[in-house]
From Swiss-Prot:
InterPro entries (UniProt xref): Ribosomal_bL34 (IPR000271), Ribosomal_bL34_CS (IPR020939)
HAMAP family linked: Ribosomal_bL34
Protein's organism: Borrelia garinii subsp. bavariensis (strain ATCC BAA-2496 / DSM 23469 / PBi) (Borreliella bavariensis)
Transmembrane stretches, start-end: none
Protein name in the entry: Large ribosomal subunit protein bL34
Origin: domain of life: Bacteria
GO cellular component, as recorded: ribonucleoprotein complex; ribosome
Classification via Pfam families: Ribosomal_L34
Membership in a protein family: Belongs to the bacterial ribosomal protein bL34 family.
């Protein structure tokens, strides 16, 4: 049986990246909450790895 997690950096960034979060009102609220909490990394795109 195939495992459910098949990592892809492109898909991950498209779904959970900074620009994806900025697109929707809800995503911007997530960023605001994470900023208020003082998170070092706001989104997965902040992990800054090469492709």
């Amino acid at each position: 049986m195939k495992r459910t997690y098949q990592p892809s950096r492109v898909k991950r960034n498209r779904k959970f990246g900074f620009r994806a979060r900025m697109k929707t009102k809800g995503g911007r609220l997530i960023l605001a909450r994470r900023r208020a909490k003082g998170r070092m990394k706001l989104t997965v795109s902040d992990e800054k790895k090469k492709y």
